[in-house]
């Protein structure tokens, strides 16, 4: 009988989470709309470290900036493996985790694009004058300023809202 409900233990939904992932469109939207990521690296003695960092999407690549007095710079020079976790703005239950490696480079054009992106964020999309862009670049342009870009090797996602919805409704998302 097709009306027979499958009885599963209470913990089943939270153990079998494969249906609670995000599609490519949602992933792209989250990465484009978010402004910050929790970024991770490891210390010399392999201890994990994370920090929330502002990023800009430049030519489709997640881009950050930092100076050589920051731990992440030294960590990623030593071991470029990184993990970035990005949550949907206003909804931490929908998240994208990106694993890959970080390229570190001196690149004035990339710094300019990063600065322009930051100013567009601050102005909420209103045009920014060339003088203001130059002023912003000067704030970033320390002699030891580097640009960092994530080369994505693996993408993991989770949609906690959908999981909660399935728990509440009892919908069977495993035997479709």
PLM regions and their residue ranges:
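Short acidic (Asp/Glu) patches
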Residues: 67-70, 79-85, 123-136
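Charged, gly/pro-rich active-site loop segments
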Residues: 1-22, 94-176
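A generic local structural motif
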Residues: 23-26, 49-51, 69-71, 134-136
